[in-house]
Structure formats: structure tokens, C-alpha cells
Design a protein with these regions (language model features):
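A short acidic, helix-capping loop that chelates divalent metal ions and anchors anionic groups
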Residues: 119-125
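A short, Lys/Arg-enriched amphipathic alpha-helix followed by its capping loop at the start of a domain
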Residues: 20-27
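Extreme N-terminal starter segment of soluble prokaryotic enzymes
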Residues: 1-4
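Conserved anion/nucleotide-ligand pocket segment
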Residues: 130-134
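Helix-loop-strand module that forms the ligand-binding subsite of alpha/beta enzymes
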Residues: 34-117
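Short N-terminal binding/cap micro-motifs at the start of the first secondary-structure element
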Residues: 12-18
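A contiguous pocket-lining binding segment that forms or flanks enzyme active sites
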Residues: 137-143
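Conserved small/polar residues in nucleotide/adenosyl-binding loops
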Residues: 145-152
């Protein structure tokens, strides 16, 4: 089983959350949806793989650019965990939007998480998040060992 971290993190908050979740996973290949030089349609995820897909929520939705790029990846029935990262306000329909895109791209959504990170514009909101306690909870929330034990 290969592990992927598919993320869009223009200000670094989403990347911190994703890193906390995958810190105890075996070697993780990162697909950076903010890259302007990547052909996302060239990615074919192996069916026995696990992907963490993390995006920020702006105005209750994921950035359309991130959704459009994620939609180009061939999920090939690989399992995925979705993460909507928000700045202590709300994440609205971000996870639904991400799940719809993941399903259309061929992924099997097995879990979804909302996580707080420091607000990207008004830094006083959720300042310093994710903090050490957040990271501990995030790491435990999607344990690679737990996911492997429940493969079907």
C-alpha cells in the first residue's frame, strides 16, 4: 500500500494539518495541488493505496482551483481521507464538495475530518493552530495502523 498526501496549502496551514495526520504513516508521496507546472492528469493512484486529501475552506467551500486540479487525478478506487481546514469560523459544504469530487475522480472516501488552522488573513483567529494538542489528536484520528487493520 502506497500513501499519498494530496494537498492545497497556499499559506501553510493546511500543510501543517496534513503533516500532523500523516506523521506516523510510512513513506508518503506528496502531490501539491498549488503547483503550476504539474500535469495532475498524469497521476494514477494504485487501487490499494491510501490518500489524504487536504484543502482549506474559504467562504464555506474549497478553492475552485484546488477542486479542478484534484478532479484530474485518477483515484482508481483507492481509499481516501478528506480534510477540510478552516480558520476557526466554519467549513460549510467543503467536505461535501471534496467528497463529490473524490467520488467522481474514482476515489473511495472512507473518512472525513474538519481541522482548525490559523486564519490565513486575520491571524488572531485560531492563532498558533494547529498546536501540539491538535497535532496529537490529528495523528491519532487517522492512524495508518488502524486503517490497515480494517481493510476490506
Amino acid at each position: 500500500m502506497r500513501c499519498y498526501q494530496i494537498l492545497f496549502s497556499p499559506t501553510g496551514g493546511t500543510e501543517k494539518v496534513a503533516a500532523a495526520i500523516t506523521q506516523n504513516w510510512p513513506e508518503v508521496q506528496t502531490i501539491d495541488l498549488s503547483s503550476t507546472s504539474t500535469d495532475f492528469a498524469s497521476f494514477f493512484i494504485e487501487s490499494d493505496s491510501l490518500a489524504l486529501v487536504a484543502m482549506p475552506s474559504f467562504g464555506d467551500v474549497a478553492p475552485q482551483l484546488a477542486i479542478d486540479r484534484f478532479a484530474q487525478i485518477n483515484g482508481n478506487r483507492a481509499k481516501c481521507v478528506l480534510v477540510a481546514v478552516y480558520g476557526n469560523r466554519a467549513y460549510g459544504s467543503t467536505l461535501v464538495q471534496m467528497a463529490d469530487t473524490a467520488n467522481a475522480a474514482g476515489f473511495q472516501v472512507i473518512a472525513a475530518i474538519s481541522a482548525i488552522a490559523e486564519h490565513s488573513i486575520i491571524h488572531e483567529y485560531a492563532a498558533g493552530r494547529p498546536n501540539a494538542e491538535d497535532c496529537k489528536q490529528l495523528s491519532a484520528s487517522v492512524s495508518y495502523t488502524h486503517l490497515r487493520a480494517h481493510e476490506t
